């Protein structure tokens, strides 16, 4: 509860951060949808002794934040309502009407009997449609509804869209209390609370003490057909009317003229009437969220700088006679898989080898997930890391990896974590176990918590001196779906953070801040990168259903469920029961079924961040856009009212919980990666991540070479594989390095056989029962660290010829062919 000035103004970005928004602006008219709930038939009994006591709720989230309700018809299986509700709708967004039949219960929570979703775009303007919904495909239950669509004379609304997401015009309502001449209140009423609600607004509900003057704001859609509701309440522990509201009041927002003040009275029993002053006005139309599937201007500028570095490195590595033109420079990307500390150490070895071979400067993109991000985040603390000897950061890692993880939970460390988390909470963040995990990681890997930020890594890109780092995470549903049934890639780079699926991005320093309808509402201090590492490598965020799927399908990449629906299919949620997204055995609305479902799909250790897409709506044709592909195993993609823009917070987890690959970042339009260097860190499944990437790519219509290792390759993998498709020049060439100990057993360096005294150093136990390299081991002896590092270093150096061959192949392609633009991802 607040008193005083509480106006929340939208934050603004510097002009340079507002450039590069290739979205479309279009004026779109409003329509008026009238919904008349007529009657239902053959509703089931509530119990053995009586019929149901049904009522219907009517909701259209894209038009109003309010949920309307019919009267309850008692003890009836054939209730008749004949009640009418009205919505002002925007015709260019996906409007899904939700009708839910409840059985009212005086003692327990009302039960949901049936739920229907209907796409109102099927109704033509001027058409009166009577619709009968079958509530149960196997039963006689039905609901009759009358629907009327009419054009209105309201001024058209200017929309901003990338044809998937839509940002609508925003208004702000300023509310202030005028207490002139009413300085005294009746006895016992000086502690009254004034609660104001504007459903569908950014603020939703605000509560104040009316004994002092105050000013505050609500931010809401200009075309939102809703009202401001107010309640004057007595404190619960007082005797003054404590159990009821005092004469609730409401103000339809459509009655307020923009820019003009309105004064209304607050009814108060036994007290002088206070007066509320209301004034509404338009918000600036500029967005803080970039709506585009293309690359941001900062990345495009980086590419131009980096190509000069890559061109010089390729000329030297391939002994070219002439300099390369910018359009002849191939794009090389690293795909670093996850694998905990094992992945971190191995990646150091792989990068060290590329540096020794003079090939690290040939890389443009450096993508990683899970444990690989620990290496990446450490290296990019130094803006010149790839130009310096990597032995420095490797020695740092060796020193800290040798420490036991238990030391990070000593009392002095716990006190430090508590203080840091308290400060984070005071800054406005929601603190979770994942944040604590990030602090433990930071202390383990670096000995202290530092103030490094993701945006600070831009210094490492200013001259194109390093590859662009890309960190990948997954957004999932918090409690009611397993990862396989709903997952969305979220990409983090020093420039921006965003969803590959929706084409919505924000500057990296604004991740965690609060947004509404594409506008920055509340800016929070940028998170330290350790908290992001807590997201990127949080394997504890899986739920029991994820573990079950991993046990069932983990060893068979062919069963990996990444199929994508035909994006041209029509919206599938026109009418039906519920959302259709749960497994049948979890669909029951009983308390026991819901409790079991929550137990199996709950994520107690996930990270929660403010959703920067919150409030944005989906375009009426979003499902037909080539960049938006729906998953074959996820009906939720066809249910816009349940997609991410409707959620106030994100639920972010380790991307390795779904697919142990960072390739989706390399598939984005505009990146046009020619060569992928794939580093595998799986102990027993050397091709799983790459085969998942291939299946994912093909399901989305992306060119990708066939990854078809033989049974012998699975059981005894080689050090390096080259996969390409000569018949499809658009497909990238892939170099794949499994984590394997092959010729390193008897070679200390490429072409140098080990002496008898050196053979022990070549024995690296990667998969045995006594292997120190298992996933959850966080402490390595120096000897084990060095063997894994040297093995990874050797495997890359020993295949220098294959790497150079791949570089020549993609260089030849670049020189002889023009790459098509706008490749679908």
Swiss-Prot record:
Membrane disposition: Peripheral membrane protein
SMART domains: C2, PLAc
Organism encoding this protein: Mus musculus
Active site: 370 (nucleophile), 654 (proton acceptor)
Pathway, per record: Lipid metabolism; fatty acid metabolism
Activity regulation: Stimulated by cytosolic Ca(2+).
Residues reported in the UniProt entry to bind substrate: 339-340
EC number: 3.1.1.4
Keyword Membrane attached: yes
Gene name as annotated: Pla2g4d
Tissue-by-tissue expression: Weakly or not expressed in most tissues. Detected in placenta of 17.5 dpc embryos.
Any Gene Ontology CC annotation: cytosol
Protein name: Cytosolic phospholipase A2 delta
The protein's enzyme class: hydrolase
UniProt: Ca(2+) 2 binding residues: 47, 103, 105, 111
Domain of life: Eukaryota
Catalytic reactions on record: a 1,2-diacyl-sn-glycero-3-phosphocholine + H2O = a 1-acyl-sn-glycero-3-phosphocholine + a fatty acid + H(+); 1-hexadecanoyl-2-(5Z,8Z,11Z,14Z-eicosatetraenoyl)-sn-glycero-3-phosphocholine + H2O = 1-hexadecanoyl-sn-glycero-3-phosphocholine + (5Z,8Z,11Z,14Z)-eicosatetraenoate + H(+); 1-hexadecanoyl-2-(9Z,12Z-octadecadienoyl)-sn-glycero-3-phosphocholine + H2O = (9Z,12Z)-octadecadienoate + 1-hexadecanoyl-sn-glycero-3-phosphocholine + H(+); 1-hexadecanoyl-2-(9Z-octadecenoyl)-sn-glycero-3-phosphocholine + H2O = 1-hexadecanoyl-sn-glycero-3-phosphocholine + (9Z)-octadecenoate + H(+)
Sequence intervals crossing the membrane: none
